[in-house]
Amino acid sequence: MKTPAWSRLAGYAWGVLLWNVLVALFGAYVRATGSGAGCGAHWPTCNGEVIPRAPQVETLIEFTHRATSGLAFLSVLALFLWALRAFPKGHPARFGAGLALFFMVTESLVGASLVLFGWTADNVSRERAVVQMVHLANTYFLLAALALTAWWASGGGPLRLRGQGAVGLALFLGLLALLFLGMSGAVTALGDLLFPVGSTLEALERSLTPGEHFLVRLRVLHPLIAVSVGLYVVFAGYLVAHLRPSPLTRRLAQGLAYLYGAQLLAGLINVALKAPVWMQILHLLLAYAVWLLFVFLATSALERGAKRVELGEGGEAVHRGTGGATWRDYLALTKPRVISLLLFTALFGALIAAKGWPGLGVFLAVALGGYMMAGAANAINMVVDRDIDARMKRTAKRPTVTQRVSSRDALLFAFALAVLGFAVLWWGANLLAATLALMGLIWYVLVYTLYLKRRTWHNIVIGGAAGAFPPLVGWAAVTGELSLFAWYLFALIFFWTPVHFWALALMIQDDYRAVGVPMLPVVLGERATVIQIALYALLTALISLMPLLLGELGLLYLAASLLLNALLLLKSLALYRRPERRTAVSLYKYSMLYLALLFAAMAVDRAV
């Protein structure tokens, strides 16, 4: 039962958290203004004095930071002592306060080491960069401990860490990713201070110049890391909100998405304005806010008694799994037949970009990493859709339906694949390729599976964009950038997808109708569907000719595309005239051959 004393302590705990955020921001101001050496190499004294006399501006700034940090230390110590007295033994708030005191001690020691070893002002050593990252990580841990203490003091329940399956893994990876992002941001901010640039273009050129200082070369990675982490954090947030569906987790996940969007916007403005001090502080404040919001999301989702959707309505035993799953069952989770065409467009995207052979390492990275990322998306899709899959003949034998693989194990498998796939693409190709693959996964799971599929017949048009990412991955793996031609490949698949999938939807419309999925034939009927297919087939044919106008492809591709498009339009016309299963099957099968041969023709044309 919550007592008035506990309420007062909770209010104090929230105040201590806020104070420490402000102190940390002021510490960033000290670094950004180059005032870290304002007290010389002395600590805890300032230039050998307890209170500096006739100080310079830099000395005043550094001394003020030390004074406010001292107050922060005392406030955390008081919080710890108060928690010991107010809460009974075993209460999580006592643990949180003790953890906060520990990280406050280490925070002070790391800050002292920066001063005592001279890693301030204009120092450009690797040691300073490493300690700067450690300092940032420790600050994150300190704020998290204070946030947990305030949460528990306010009546939040204890956490259940065991048996959380993929939710626990997703949250752990999210915290790890945000920590990594913050550390990369600390190094980038240090580079902005020590190696200022006149423009964004100059920053990019210098970061790609061999022999430049490591702080300069690392600068270009932070934006890509920010996008990658942002995609994952938003994905993890909404997935956790789906699997732990309380009003609070939903609000936190939604707030996290908006807040991270604001953080990315602030980062872009920071780059455009060449990192002024005030913008650096705002950017860091948003980073702290994102971190704390994710901590609260994790705490809410992992509380004892939280509803666990992945276990099903019938209780834990319903989707526990029957045991005896083989490697074939896990392979089936990835939908290898579906992936084959996605992988083909990714690999041929690499061949098209390279105008020939891209190299064995890149080719294998795209093949293996691409398969893992797509397989992860498909496995998550099987878990989310297992209720309707059980009622459709085409999907009734999937491992998540037959329960040969439990929902928990399927999600763990999916997250493992996603992490490994991202790592393979980053290591074997580059971060841009890995980020694009992650974007495709998130689009398929969040936009298509979780949001659009059961809401609107536009699900295929919008959600189908997920299938257009593979050629971007292949292209980026080779070139490290996305040209206009790469986006043309994206557009081609985007407009081709409705032709392909609506033909399938016509074939199995009774299944979709039975489970209430609003595919186009179910909502508007066969006539409207075949008209839409014909229109998208015409758009696909027109888009396929665009590279010829841009001078990117030659006569070989022209001949192949004319033949392939003629057949596509003829089969679409045949379906329009006779909207029956036989013509739908014919178009469905040909659409796959069409896309594969069109990409092959591009690759051959650019190679010869």
UniProtKB/Swiss-Prot annotation:
Ranges that cross the membrane: 10-30, 67-87, 99-119, 139-159, 167-187, 220-240, 252-272, 277-297, 338-357, 362-384, 411-431, 432-452, 460-480, 488-508, 530-550, 555-575, 584-604
Region of interest (Protoheme IX prenyltransferase), residue spans: 339-606
One GO BP: heme A biosynthetic process
Pathway recorded for this protein: Porphyrin-containing compound metabolism; heme O biosynthesis; heme O from protoheme: step 1/1
EC number: 2.5.1.141
Record keyword Transport present: no
Subcellular location: Cell inner membrane
GO terms of molecular function: oxidoreductase activity, acting on NAD(P)H, heme protein as acceptor; protoheme IX farnesyltransferase activity
Cellular component terms per the entry's GO annotation: plasma membrane
Classification via Gene3D superfamilies: UbiA prenyltransferase
Domain of life: Bacteria
Catalytic activity: heme b + (2E,6E)-farnesyl diphosphate + H2O = Fe(II)-heme o + diphosphate
Family matches, as Pfam families: COX15-CtaA (PF02628), UbiA (PF01040)
Its membrane topology: Multi-pass membrane protein
CDD domains listed in its UniProt record: PT_UbiA_Cox10 (cd13957)
Segments of this protein annotated with the region COX15/CtaA: 1-304
Alphabetic keyword roster: Cell inner membrane, Cell membrane, Heme biosynthesis, Membrane, Transferase, Transmembrane, Transmembrane helix
Chief subcellular location: membrane
Further comment: Carbon 2 of the heme B porphyrin ring is defined according to the Fischer nomenclature. Protoheme IX farnesyltransferase subfamily.
Job description of the protein: Converts heme B (protoheme IX) to heme O by substitution of the vinyl group on carbon 2 of heme B porphyrin ring with a hydroxyethyl farnesyl side group.
Protein family per UniProt: In the N-terminal section; belongs to the COX15/CtaA family. In the C-terminal section; belongs to the UbiA prenyltransferase family. Protoheme IX farnesyltransferase subfamily.
Annotated protein name in UniProt: Protoheme IX farnesyltransferase
Organism whose genome encodes this protein: Thermus thermophilus (strain ATCC BAA-163 / DSM 7039 / HB27)
Lineage: Bacteria, Thermotogati, Deinococcota, Deinococci, Thermales
